[in-house]
Amino acid sequence: TGAESGIKWPNDIVLNSKKICGILTELHFTERGCVVIVGTGINVNTESFPEEIKGIASSLKLETGKEVSREALIVSIMKYFEVYYEKYVQTEDLSFLREQYESMLINKGKKVRVLDPKAPYEGIARGINVQGNLMVACEDGTEKCVDSGEVSVRGLYGYV
């Protein structure tokens, strides 16, 4: 479609600078090991949004101008999930995803505002480290490691 798509760190999928998908994960420890629960919300064929989020949220239908088959979409997502999951099972390592994730990181190289409850700050998003934390180069020359559980990141001129 020629639309700009990517990932807004850490877990939003954006299309034309608007959020169309959010992904949440929850980690649980059991006697048998770790369990990760993944939840994904995708705005597929939504045609309107409340006024307060209209500028930052959209749907696949609104951005592409086409009705999207939910069934075909979930089949495609699960196909890719299975491929990546099998690779993880074989290696017990997710580092193979880092380069691909970074190539799709829409705020990489851009000025961001980190809404840290202790003290908000601004800097340039440099990418992610091996733990998936966002690395931000601050104006004072320091580099900060941003943990997704602590803060919210916004673009200087809007959501992205």
Language model features: what each stretch is:
Residues 1-5, 15-160:
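Long, positively charged amphipathic alpha-helical accessory segments at protein N-termini or as interdomain linkers
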